[in-house]
From Swiss-Prot:
Designated name of the protein: Eukaryotic translation initiation factor 1A, Y-chromosomal
Residue spans of biased composition, Basic residues class: 1-15
Gene coding for it: EIF1AY
Tissue and organ distribution: Ubiquitous.
Crosslink position(s): Glycyl lysine isopeptide (Lys-Gly) (interchain with G-Cter in ubiquitin): K88
GO biological process: translational initiation
GO MF, one annotated term: tRNA binding
PROSITE patterns (UniProt xref): IF1A, S1_IF1_TYPE
PANTHER family in the cross-refs: EIF-1A (PTHR21668)
Organism: Homo sapiens
Lineage start: Eukaryota, Metazoa, Chordata, Craniata, Vertebrata
InterPro entries: NA-bd_OB-fold, RNA-binding_domain_S1_IF1, TIF_eIF-1A, TIF_eIF-1A_CS
Subcellular location: Cytoplasm
């Protein structure tokens, strides 16, 4: 049987959680960039996004974001426009809900942009769920 000469398994490849909940500086768009909202995830590192200049573009998630940052539909992203292809773009950055709200407050995003409020359902969030008792408790399963 061969010796294990590797340097670790999946966990080593996954890497450390860098700046998980650390606040980062708000990044504004520059020339050649545009804000967009994700319409549809296409798979294979691609997505369809509606840029706020009114153009629907096919976007490619770059390698730095590919496995570290999870992008869902209706997320606000920053895309880099291509000079040679107007209908394609590259995802540069994903804004979280707080950053998207502050971008909207600064007037960078239009008013019709809907910011996705995803709830992670942490501990103690189950207080609002109400279940109704369906059926009678005195009914025995043998009587059916």
């Amino acid at each position: 049987m061969p010796k294990n000469k590797g340097k670790g398994g999946k966990n080593r490849r996954r890497g450390k959680n860098e700046n998980e909940s650390e606040k980062r500086e708000l990044v504004f768009k520059e020339d050649g960039q545009e804000y967009a909202q994700v319409i549809k995830m296409l798979g294979n590192g691609r997505l369809e996004a509606l840029c706020f200049d009114g153009v629907k573009r096919l976007c490619h998630i770059r390698g730095k974001l590919r496995k570290k940052v999870w992008i869902n539909t209706s997320d606000i992203i920053l895309v880099g426009l291509r000079d040679y292809q107007d209908n394609k773009a590259d995802v540069i950055l994903k804004y979280n809900a707080d950053e998207a709200r502050s971008l909207k407050a600064y007037g960078e995003l239009p008013e019709h942009a809907k910011i996705n409020e995803t709830d992670t359902f942490g501990p103690g969030d189950d207080d609002e769920i109400q279940f109704d008792d369906i059926g009678d408790d005195d009914e025995d399963i043998d009587d059916i």
